[in-house]
């Protein structure tokens, strides 16, 4: 039997972490927040469902997932309420990330107001909290169309202690680090302005530094490190490529992606994917982003050494190729020839291979 222990290592880009105090909130005698949902955008009338959340909010309608049972996946609104009593005095950071509109009120006073639609926002507010004093927290949200996302937590922000994180997994037989990028960082126009990311565009292709440093700390434990890299585009990760025991590029694998990744890591499925784009070693390998010429871009014109070339991919089996033959066709159809390539699985595990053929004019 295999025991899997989960630990959040770091955020995508930020080198600080939140020491959550969500459990210092309560509603109706329960830890956490009371949640009321309406099947309209305006919180009008009686709520159609009332429930409670005991953990920091991390809600989405991706994959037609509802925020709570019976709640619509579009055109709805919600109010989350809780009373927060800090155990110590000091600065407490409230972090809200949402799509579409949201607003945060503390003791009835709006401190975050992003009551708009059609864009993603990531906002923080810092409260100078007093020990033992109660604060009434209200978070309101509405979904207009498209994606519905809402994340909320509160607590002290502290620098990430890489060695501490690594020490907590140092006795594992293997360490699986799932990182990379997120659709909340790259994509269409969005309110993101972080190192390497601007408004949905990427200003650098490197793996965010916080993840690179954490991978190095994990590798220093001496345990095997597998990097599961999620992204929607190429990522430069030369250290990981050279030092991790394995890198599994998952892109954004969808609702059943976790099961598929587990099957590959457990050896129940022989991976056969191939890269549909070139992975470069550095942003400096590429021309200026605003230079639209194709010189020194893509597998066709890149003049340097790629980190991983277009079409690259490994599996658990070795495949051998026989002599290829080309048979011209004379039937006048669209095809002019047939290419035959004998392929043999020389490994011990059943698997698929992707035969790649490239044609160019001379």
Identify the role of each PLM range.
Residues 162, 169, 212-215, 258-262:
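Extracytoplasmic/secreted envelope proteins and their assembly/folding machinery
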Residues 215-223:
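Surface-exposed amphipathic alpha-helices with a cationic face
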């Amino acid at each position: 039997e295999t025991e899997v222990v989960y630990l959040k290592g770091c955020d995508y880009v930020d080198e600080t972490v939140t020491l959550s105090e969500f459990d210092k909130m309560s509603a109706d005698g329960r830890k956490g927040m009371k949640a009321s949902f309406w099947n309209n955008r305006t919180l009008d009338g009686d709520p159609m469902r009332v429930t409670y959340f005991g953990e920091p909010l991390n809600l989405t309608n991706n994959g037609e997932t509802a925020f709570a049972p019976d709640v619509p996946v579009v055109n709805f609104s919600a109010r989350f309420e809780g009373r927060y009593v800090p155990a110590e005095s000091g600065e407490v950071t409230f972090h809200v990330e949402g799509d579409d509109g949201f607003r945060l009120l503390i003791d009835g006073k709006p401190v975050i107001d992003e009551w708009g639609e059609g864009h993603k926002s990531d906002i923080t507010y810092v409260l100078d909290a007093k020990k033992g004093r109660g604060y009434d927290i209200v978070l309101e949200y509405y979904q207009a169309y498209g994606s519905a996302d809402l994340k909320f937590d509160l607590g002290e922000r502290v620098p990430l202690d890489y060695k501490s994180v690594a020490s907590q997994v140092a006795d594992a037989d293997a360490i699986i680090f799932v990182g990379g990028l997120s659709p909340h960082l790259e994509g269409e126009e969005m309110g993101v302005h972080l190192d390497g990311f601007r408004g949905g565009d990427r200003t650098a292709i490197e793996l965010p530094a916080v993840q690179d440093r954490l991978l190095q700390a994990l590798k220093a434990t001496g345990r095997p490190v597998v990097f599961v890299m999620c992204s929607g585009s190429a990522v430069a990760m030369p250290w990981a490529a050279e030092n991790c025991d394995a890198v599994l590029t998952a892109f954004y694998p969808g609702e059943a992606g976790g099961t598929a990744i587990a099957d590959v890591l457990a050896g129940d499925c022989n991976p056969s994917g191939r890269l549909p784009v070139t992975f470069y070693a550095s942003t400096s390998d590429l021309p200026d982003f605003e230079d639209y010429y194709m010189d020194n871009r893509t597998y066709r014109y890149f003049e340097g050494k790629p980190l991983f070339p277009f079409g690259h991919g490994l599996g658990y089996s070795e495949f051998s190729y026989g002599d290829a033959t080309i048979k011209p066709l004379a039937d006048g159809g669209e095809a002019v020839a047939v290419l035959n390539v004998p392929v043999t699985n020389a490994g011990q595990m059943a698997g698929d291979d992707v035969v790649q053929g490239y044609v160019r004019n001379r």
